[in-house]
Structure formats: C-alpha cells, structure tokens
Design a protein with these regions (language model features):
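Active-site-proximal substrate-binding core of FAD-dependent oxidoreductases
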Residues: 493-538
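Active-site/ligand-binding neighborhood in enzyme catalytic cores
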Residues: 142-257, 261
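Short hydrophobic core segments
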Residues: 8, 255, 276-290
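C-terminal segments that line or cap access tunnels to active or ligand-binding sites in enzymes
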Residues: 216-226, 278-280, 288-454, 458-485, ...
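Glycine-rich FAD pyrophosphate-binding loop
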Residues: 22-49
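Dinucleotide-binding Rossmann-like beta1-alpha1 core, especially the glycine-rich loop
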Residues: 51-142
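Conserved beta-strand-loop-beta-strand element in the redox core of flavoprotein oxidoreductases
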Residues: 257-276
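N-terminal Rossmann-like FAD-binding beta1-loop-alpha1 element of flavoenzymes
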Residues: 3-30
C-alpha cells in the first residue's frame, strides 16, 4: 500500500512536491486555503469582465518570467503533458530584449554578447551600463564590485558577503545620485525586487550576475515568458496531470495548527474540517504563514524553525492594463529606472500567439500591459503618497502616470489615455480602510545576515519537511525556481525517511562561466588564509 504524504500549500512548491512524489508512487493530498491551485503564479479571472459567450479578462498577481538560470522549474514543465503530444515547456517563448526606460531620456535596450575571459566580462559590463550616464570612475568601481562577487569562492560569499548590505558593498552612500538611483536602487529593486540598503550582498550580487550571465552565455537564454495566461498554459494542465497520477486536492482548506509528539508530527488541524493524518508531511507554505504556525512546542521539537518570524517580507504585486491597441514596448521586459515605485512590465500579446484576444472580455481588448510594483513605501508622482497609502484608483493613476513618464518621450506617445479600456489590481492588495492597503501575499526578501534564520528542507522532525522559497537552496532568492528546488529537497527527505528505492529528485547548482573557476579557486585559498579578495585593493 502506498505511503501517504500531506502537502500543505498548493502553490508552485506544493504542486512541484506533489509531482515528484506522485511520479514515485506516493499517495498525495494537497491542502490549499484558496479555492484554486497555483498560489502567486495562478491566473485570476477579472470579475464581471466577460460577455456571456466570452472568457473573463486574465488578471494575475504578477507576470511570470523564467530567467535563463531556471533549471528546476523547466525540468518540471517538461514532464507536464500539454495538448496531444506536447508539454508545458512548449508554452515558453524566448524574450530577446530587456528595455531600460528612463523618464524623459533615451531608452536603453540590452542584447546578448559572449565574453570568454574576465577582461571580456569587465568590458561587457562597462558597455552594458555606460548608457545610464553614471560617471565613468564610479561605473568602473561598480563593475569591479560585481567582478569580486563573480570571482569569489562560496565560502567568502556565505561567511563574508552574506553579512553585508549590497548598498554598502557597492559604496553607494559616497557615490553620485545617478549611481545610487540606477545602479544601487533601480537595478536591485527591478531585477531582484529587493532594497539595496537592506539586502544581502551574497543574494543580490549572485542573482544579478545570474541574470546577466543569460546575456553572455551562448547556450543560455536571457529570459522566457509564457505564451498565454499562466493557468491556461501551465497551472491547469499541471493539476490535470497530477489528478491523473492520483493526487487529491482539497481547496478552501486553511491550516490551523501542526500537532507534534516528540520528534514526530501526529496530525494537522484545519479550520472547518476534520483533523488530517498522513505518514509524512510537507509544509509548502509562505514564510509568514508557516511562522504563524510555529508554536512553542514546535520550536522545542524543531529549533531550526524557531526564528522564521525574523525573516522579512516586502510587497511585490501587479496591475494589468487592458488596451484598445496593442503596445509591444519591447520583446521582453521593460524596467522603469526612474519610477519611484520600481515598475517593471511585459506587453503580453506579442507572446500569446495562440490565444484569440477577441474571445476575452467583450472582445475589444487588443493588448495587455502587465506591470509589477516592487516599491510600496516611496511617494508617487501624482499624489505624493506611498503605494501602501493609496486607494486602488490612486494606485492605477500613479502607475499609469509613471509608465507614461518613461515611454512617452521625445514627442512619441506610446501610451495613450484613450486606449486604456480597463485595469485590474492584484486582489491580494486589500483595502480595509481608505487610507491604507494590506497585502495578503507578500514576498520574502533576504536581508543581510538572514541566512542564519533560514532552515534546510530537513528539520529536526522525522516526518515533516519544508518546501518553500525561504528554505536554503542553490537558487537563494524568493521565486518559483527556489520554491521548486525546495520542493525537490523536501521530496528527497521523504524518500530517505520512507526507505524508498525510487531515484531522488534532481538538483542543479547555479552555473557560472567556466573562465571564472580558477579565480574562484584562488580566492578559496586566500579566504582560507584570512586574506581579502585579490581584486579588493585595486
């Protein structure tokens, strides 16, 4: 008789764990508080937007993108059937450009190059960032700091860079305003949704480099985007596949407590439902939810999760604009560097090649501009209020105005008010009172020194394992890839604990250019001797 695994949470982590387990013969139950699966990745039908014979307009928590360094999620998608003979991976399109838009200034487009040495990489990075208008000597310093991270050994990254805020590592306080705005704040907020002033140099530096390596690796794409609404081309086929494997779904189930006896979980209590029992449990819950379930008894049984409440979250949520005319903007991401709210966007129709837009809403929408807001605590350009203090209508007006400041320059009118038919704000942004918003699904951020509070997938309990983006992973940043990797790690713990003979779920370390390896080995020797990085004094 197959052993039973209870997966708490039906987002990317929970679905990933369920797939790996079900493919290995386990009987899996997924419990999810929302009425649908997919977590932050799910599509959200816009209420009241459709004619009787049409589909609702597709909304979302935020647009999905799959950088070139994603391997775990990609492997999972290749195993999800789609259509007659394809799989979900077939629903990814390669984005060929990334646009850096500035208010009232010429836009910058990044394209790929192929450096093969450290000097090539330095020249490439200098050329990449030069159009931002940062003083040359400051730009050279910033590039040198990136190269230090690139050529550092893992030990230095963890034991030294983990404790330093990126803002301090790149010496932003003593640099020009352009340096601070574009290289310090803009790239950090937009590329990794983190604040340079508080975020770990290890996480920010490595993630920025991984994204940039997508521009320099001939065998890696910079980015991929879905060819349709996320639920249509990924989440729904995924849940259908899991059902075919025998996975049972329990939507609308909110976890109330985790019961322990010694080193074992004995059951899960839920609101408005019977107590849950299983052979093994995987907690695939966001950090703020899991932290709320960690009681004193659970802390005593599993000390490694006692400090989850010390991990911090910030807001990163989306708004979609539905347009009467399509505005492609760029074949990929647009980053709005002068936006006080750290906006990024994707114009989706150019990638949704197999979807008939006339079947959405009332048939009048010709384009969708999906925008992520990564900074919620800085004043906007219209009302002078932070996003957190705005009403939904003020949020829409502010984001639209900030987009126009960046795109409508040089006499061009890329965005026209008359083309804006409607908009949709992530419903996780809630408005309990008119003067302040709340966020039901914030995003984990890796503040300097926070690694010590993050547990492994394997904790002290014999039958409870963790699968969420706060778990220690190679990926090391809150995203779908980290969630999927953590799920694989949790599944491997189940395999060991159950004495299964099934092969373990595959794991991939982050890839770095081969020409960096000798320099990293040199730094390992220097670090072991207590010496600084060899580039630090230059």
């Amino acid at each position: 008789m197959p052993q039973t695994v209870c997966v708490l949470g039906g987002g990317v982590a929970g679905l990933s764990a369920a797939q790996e387990l079900a493919e290995r013969g386990f009987h899996v139950h997924i419990y999810e508080r929302k009425p649908v699966m997919g977590g932050k990745a799910r599509s959200i039908p816009v209420p009241g937007s459709a004619l009787p014979d049409h589909k609702p307009l597709p909304g979302e928590h935020g647009f999905r993108f799959f950088p070139g360094f994603y391997k775990h999620v990609i492997d999972t998608m290749r195993r999800i059937p789609y259509g007659a003979h394809g799989n979900a991976f077939d629903n990814l399109a390669v984005a060929t450009r990334i646009l850096l838009a500035r208010a009232g200034q010429t836009e910058i487009t990044w394209v790929a190059r192929c450096p093969s040495s450290l000097e090539d990489l330095r020249v490439f990075l200098m050329e990449l960032f030069t159009p931002l208008g940062v003083p040359p000597e400051e730009l050279a310093y910033f590039v040198s700091r990136l190269l230090i991270v690139a050529t550092s050994c893992p030990e230095r990254r963890l034991m030294e860079f983990e404790k330093i805020a990126w803002w301090d590592f790149i010496a932003a306080p003593r640099m020009s305003k352009a340096y601070q705005v574009y290289l310090g704040e803009g790239l950090t907020r937009s590329l990794v949704a983190m604040r340079a002033e508080e975020s770990s140099t290890r996480t920010v530096g490595i993630t920025q480099l991984q994204l940039l390596y997508g521009l320099i690796s001939p065998d890696r794409v910079f980015d991929r985007l879905l060819t349709g609404p996320t639920s249509d081309v990924w989440i729904d086929p995924w849940t259908q596949y899991l059902r075919s494997l025998g996975v049972e779904f329990h939507p609308g189930t909110r976890v109330a407590g985790i019961e322990v006896d010694g080193a074992r979980v004995t059951g899960i209590t839920v609101n408005d439902g019977p107590r849950i029992e299983a052979d093994f449990y995987i907690a695939a819950l966001p950090v703020e939810v899991m932290a709320s379930l960690v009681t004193d008894s659970l802390k005593r049984a599993a000390p490694s999760i006692a400090n989850l409440d010390k991990l911090q979250t910030r807001w990163m949520n989306g708004i979609q604009f539905y347009l009467a005319h399509d505005v492609p903007v760029v074949n990929g991401h647009a980053i709005y560097l002068d936006s006080p709210w750290a906006l990024t966007s994707i114009s989706q129709r150019q990638f949704w090649t197999n979807f008939d837009f006339s079947q959405f809403g009332n048939g009048s929408v010709k384009g969708i501009l999906s925008v992520d807001i990564s900074e919620w605590q800085q004043p906007g350009v219209i009302y002078g209020k932070p996003a957190q203090e705005c009403t939904a209508e003020e949020l829409e007006a502010e984001v639209w105005a900030q987009l126009k400041q960046h795109l409508n320059e040089g006499g061009a009118t890329t965005l026209n008010d008359a083309d804006l038919l409607s908009w949709f704000l992530d419903p996780d942004i809630e408005f309990p009172n008119p003067s302040a918003a709340t966020n039901a699904e914030p995003l984990l951020i890796n503040t300097a020194g926070s690694f010590q509070y993050r547990p492994e997938a394997q904790i002290e309990l014999e039958n409870l394992f963790l699968a969420s983006d706060y778990v220690r992973t190679y990926t090391d940043i809150a995203c779908m890839e980290a969630a999927n990797e953590a799920a694989r790690r949790a599944v491997n713990c189940v395999l060991v604990a159950s004495n299964s003979t099934a092969p373990p779920a595959l794991l991939w370390p982050l890839e770095e250019p081969a020409f960096l390896k000798p320099l990293q080995e040199l730094d390992r020797i220097r670090f072991g001797l207590g010496l600084p990085h060899h580039l630090a004094s230059r």
